[in-house]
């Protein structure tokens, strides 16, 4: 049994990062990729192991993966992740953290390879069916999909778990067993341990038939993508928001399809039918004077200026002040708002020696900004500049002492304008 079972037609890239948990599936994947590398010396192969910290055996799994990778001469990256509660359940938490770590680890020109197989595909389809998903959700997983500016490949997707076991036994491979895989309280484990064995006992080719249905659903989705491409282009702005006016005259079915595709473009979770109805009724059709907001995990859908926005939830920083004692170096902002820095060359004056520098998120009184006559309150300036309400208390305001100098990327005050060529710019990396 030496013929590779992975789909080598996917492996056009010569730089591969393999997801390696140390379990059966990923061990077979990595082993076959090592053999592929032997046949193609120009291939560069790395592995990544995610330490979730959920199991008391997690540290020993790291050591196992290090031993395997050392034996196979595969550089291994170990990433430790922290699972934050986003309301989606432990399985979704772990997956989100895992794929975020993958994205952060990928090098330019590298593709990600994961070890999902035919039985996984069947489980994914049935879970989507349980949620009442449409063709998009029932498309399950593709062998190739866009990911983090590159590709995510699933070279074993046509193979069954049984064939992977046969490969592993034939080649004397060692792998770890995650005890959580035996807990049928998890939906996927329930399917694998209890439901699918019964279905396969009755219909041995059930997983393959399900995979064919998933492929047909995917084809229908691609056709819809083609048919709706023009509508989608008309609806989406350069900022990635969704214009509401074109949707008003669409049928319910067409509008829902546009909403789904827009959310997919924003990397949002696939919404249920009820969720789409709530987006339309509670956000899109809310009163004109309302500021509607619908939470989805750690993101929100909001409406502003007759557009829908998909944004990350951030707590308001209205009362926050961040001192910036060494303004020549970047400053980290709270609540994951990124960093700011003052760089040479720009329209802001430098702070005087006696002036303390800070970042705040509110400013009292009347403000006089460059390019405007008269004074205005900050709220009025935000409105004139078209700054959405949720950004108004999270946009960094630069102060020298008690004097407002600038709002990052929005305006400069007259008191903050440079008087010579030695000015600086306030750069915000959100």
Curated annotation (Swiss-Prot):
CDD domains: TilS_N. Transmembrane segments: none annotated. Its EC number is 6.3.4.19. It comes from Salmonella schwarzengrund (strain CVM19633). The keyword Transferase does not apply. HAMAP family: tRNA_Ile_lys_synt (MF_01161). It comes from the Bacteria. Ligates lysine onto the cytidine present at position 34 of the AUA codon-specific tRNA(Ile) that contains the anticodon CAU, in an ATP-dependent manner. Cytidine is converted to lysidine, thus changing the amino acid specificity of the tRNA from methionine to isoleucine. GO terms for molecular function: ATP binding; tRNA(Ile)-lysidine synthase activity. GO terms for biological process: tRNA modification. ATP binds at residues 21-26. It is found in: Cytoplasm. This is tRNA(Ile)-lysidine synthase. It holds the Pfam family ATP_bind_3. Belongs to the tRNA(Ile)-lysidine synthase family. The N-terminal region contains the highly conserved SGGXDS motif, predicted to be a P-loop motif involved in ATP binding. Keywords: ATP-binding, Cytoplasm, Ligase, Nucleotide-binding, tRNA processing.
């Amino acid at each position: 049994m030496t013929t590779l079972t992975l789909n080598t037609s996917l492996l056009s890239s010569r730089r591969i990062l393999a997801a390696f948990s140390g379990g059966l599936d990923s061990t077979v994947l990595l082993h076959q990729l090592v053999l592929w590398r032997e046949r193609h010396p120009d291939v560069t192969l790395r592995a990544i192991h995610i330490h979730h910290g959920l199991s008391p055996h997690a540290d020993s799994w790291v050591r196992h993966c290090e031993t395997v990778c050392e034996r196979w001469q595969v550089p291994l990256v170990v990433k430790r992740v922290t699972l934050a509660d986003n309301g989606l359940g432990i399985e979704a938490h772990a997956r989100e953290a895992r794929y975020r770590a993958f994205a952060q680890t990928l090098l330019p020109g590298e593709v990600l390879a994961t070890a999902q197989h035919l039985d996984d595909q069947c489980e994914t389809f049935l879970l989507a069916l349980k949620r009442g998903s449409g063709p998009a959700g029932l498309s399950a997983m593709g062998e190739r999909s866009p990911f983090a500016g590159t590709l995510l490949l699933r070279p074993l997707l046509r193979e069954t778990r049984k064939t992977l076991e046969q490969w592993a036994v034939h080649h004397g491979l060692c792998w770890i067993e995650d005890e959580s895989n035996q807990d049928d309280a998890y939906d996927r484990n329930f399917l694998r341990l209890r439901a699918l064995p019964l279905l396969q006992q009755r219909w041995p080719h059930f997983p393959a038939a399900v995979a064919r249905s998933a492929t047909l659903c995917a084809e229908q989705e691609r056709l819809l993508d083609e048919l709706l491409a023009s509508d989608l282009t008309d609806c989406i702005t350069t900022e990635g928001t969704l214009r509401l006016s074109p949707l008003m005259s669409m049928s319910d079915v067409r509008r829902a399809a546009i909403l789904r595709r827009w959310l997919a473009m924003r990397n949002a979770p696939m919404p249920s039918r009820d969720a789409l109805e709530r987006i339309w009724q509670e956000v899109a059709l809310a009163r004109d004077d309302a500021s509607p907001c619908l939470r989805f995990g750690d993101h929100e859908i909001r409406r502003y200026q007759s557009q829908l926005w998909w944004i990350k939830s951030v707590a308001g920083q209205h009362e926050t002040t961040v001192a910036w004692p060494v303004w020549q170096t970047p400053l980290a902002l709270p609540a994951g708002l990124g960093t700011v820095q003052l760089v040479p060359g720009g329209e802001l004056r430098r702070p005087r020696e006696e002036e303390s520098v800070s970042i705040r998120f509110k400013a009292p009184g009347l403000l006089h900004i460059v390019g405007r006559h008269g004074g205005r309150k900050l709220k009025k300036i935000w409105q004139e500049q078209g700054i959405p309400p949720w950004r108004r208390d999270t946009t960094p305001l630069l102060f020298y002492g008690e004097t407002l100098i600038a709002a990052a990327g929005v305006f400069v005050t007259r008191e903050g304008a440079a008087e010579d060529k030695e000015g600086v710019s306030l750069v915000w990396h959100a």
